[in-house]
UniProtKB/Swiss-Prot annotation:
This is S-ribosylhomocysteine lyase. Belongs to the LuxS family. The keyword Transmembrane does not apply. The keyword Heme does not apply. The lineage of its organism: Bacteria, Pseudomonadati, Campylobacterota, Epsilonproteobacteria, Campylobacterales. Fe cation binds at residues 54, 58, 128. Its cofactor is Fe cation. Binds 1 Fe cation per subunit. It catalyses: S-(5-deoxy-D-ribos-5-yl)-L-homocysteine = (S)-4,5-dihydroxypentane-2,3-dione + L-homocysteine. GO terms for biological process: quorum sensing.
Length: 171
């Protein structure tokens, strides 16, 4: 099995919260695709709470589109990482990390403006697979923490992991 890109970065050195361009590629038709690592938590030190992450997923996706889509950029998907330290965002186009950072911060402010659980998009049994697993309070706490700490741009060269030199397994 090939070693995935996400396992070729040193999670010990990774700063958080921060934005990282995880991958860029071209489709066979020549379209640019960018994948961003939106790291909310320092890996192996903290994780996002389950219910707050789920609520954030419902809110963050729409707000990021409001702030980032346009001028050749369109968000394909924003999904939480299995390790619960952040989200991956796939985008058509090549927005700068600074533009992503600005949109992320604006989205966190928008999340704090949502005052009622009933205002969470698609929060019903027809559109959400676990519609009872939400917490607006936890989502607010996550957003507040990001705004208080600010965001860094994560440099890929600084966190590149040499799996051969470290003797790590490549499955």
């Amino acid at each position: 099995m090939p070693l995935l890109d996400s396992f070729c970065v040193d999670h010990v050195k990774m700063k958080a919260p921060g934005v990282r361009l995880a991958k860029s590629m071209k489709t066979p038709k020549g379209d640019d695709i960018s994948v961003f690592d939106l790291r909310f938590c320092k890996p192996n030190e903290e994780i996002l709470p389950e219910k707050g992450t789920h609520t954030l997923e419902h809110l963050f996706a729409g707000f990021m589109r409001n702030h980032l889509n346009g001028n050749g950029v369109e968000i394909i998907d924003i999904s939480p990482m299995g390790c619960r330290t952040g989200f991956y965002m796939s985008v058509i186009g090549t927005p700068s990390e600074e533009a992503v950072k600005k949109a992320w911060l604006a989205s966190m402010k928008d999340i704090l403006e949502v005052k009622d659980q009933d205002k969470i998009p698609e929060l019903n049994k027809f559109q959400c697979g676990t519609y009872k697993m939400h917490s607006l309070d936890e989502a607010h706490a996550i957003a507040s923490k990001i705004l208080a700490q600010g965001l860094v741009i994560i440099n890929n060269d600084e966190i590149k992991l040499d799996v051969d030199a470290m003797g790590l397994k490549k499955h």
